[in-house]
Amino acid sequence: MSALILDGKSVTKKSEEDLRSRVARLKELSNGAVPILATILVGNDPSSATYVKMKSNACTRVGMDSLKVEMSEETTTEELLAEIAKLNANPNIHGILLQHPVPPQINERQCFDSIDLSKDVDGVTCWGFGRMAMNETSYGSATPKGIIRILEAYDIQLEGKHAVVVGRSPILGKPMAMMLLNKNCTVTICHSKTVGLDKIIKTADIVVGAVGKPEFIKADWIKDDAVVIDAGYHEGGIGDIELQPLMSRVKAYTPVPGGVGPMTINTLIYQTVEACELKLAQ
């Protein structure tokens, strides 16, 4: 049996074609204005700078603009809050991304929660998470929302399925579980300290690896015909799941790289365009 490859690059390419049309339409309706994503980079972390550049490039590909705000390593919580307040008040900014991580002297949660809900296109505020958990309108955290979009693009059945999410981070594991629950999955949330993890995963129709440890989830823990989503990425191009032995016996899987990663950035852009459309409709 050959497993279905859930190709995030392919889904992203199709999404970008649609987003280009939507941005062009917004430009017509707003006298040349286009959606703008503001990214805030605090400090000198090279990986963060790379991610911000990738997001800027994604904006360009669909005809959007991006505004990069760079702040020093010595930035205080108060200074960052003031910058976010300016972006909240700017009517030309439709989405705000605070690149994680920030320097240790900054209260990251306080800064995340200061982002206006209508501009929280990365789905990082507690208020947004609460609305999402209650199945109310909100912007989902970009990675789990991207995973849902991949599953829907390939018509993977979710309703009635048992999904095991391995990981409990506030921007991935927890929102992933809530989104799957909202799609009528029966959801079990596990983590690296779960007792009997292998036995629990063996019961899963859908496995989401979001634990942040390379190949932590072993291939023989996963049953035949499962759908395998690997949200991890580590040095050497491996994820959180031991994928290689699974490729011939599971129903479908996301490759690493090229699966979840492209959809995370695309979802950020997708939700920024959506925010602009909603504002224009008001």
UniProtKB/Swiss-Prot annotation:
GO BP terms, alphabetized: L-histidine biosynthetic process; methionine biosynthetic process; purine nucleotide biosynthetic process; tetrahydrofolate interconversion
Its EC number(s): 1.5.1.5, 3.5.4.9
GO molecular function, one term: methenyltetrahydrofolate cyclohydrolase activity
Pfam families linked: THF_DHG_CYH (PF00763), THF_DHG_CYH_C (PF02882)
Reaction catalyzed: (6R)-5,10-methylene-5,6,7,8-tetrahydrofolate + NADP(+) = (6R)-5,10-methenyltetrahydrofolate + NADPH; (6R)-5,10-methenyltetrahydrofolate + H2O = (6R)-10-formyltetrahydrofolate + H(+)
Superkingdom field: Bacteria
Keywords annotated in UniProt: Amino-acid biosynthesis, Histidine biosynthesis, Hydrolase, Methionine biosynthesis, Multifunctional enzyme, NADP, One-carbon metabolism, Oxidoreductase, Purine biosynthesis
Family annotation (CDD domains): NAD_bind_m-THF_DH_Cyclohyd
Keyword Ubl conjugation recorded: no
GO CC annotations, alphabetized: cytosol
Job description of the protein: Catalyzes the oxidation of 5,10-methylenetetrahydrofolate to 5,10-methenyltetrahydrofolate and then the hydrolysis of 5,10-methenyltetrahydrofolate to 10-formyltetrahydrofolate.
Family label: Belongs to the tetrahydrofolate dehydrogenase/cyclohydrolase family.
Name of the molecule in the record: Bifunctional protein FolD 1
Gene of this entry: folD1
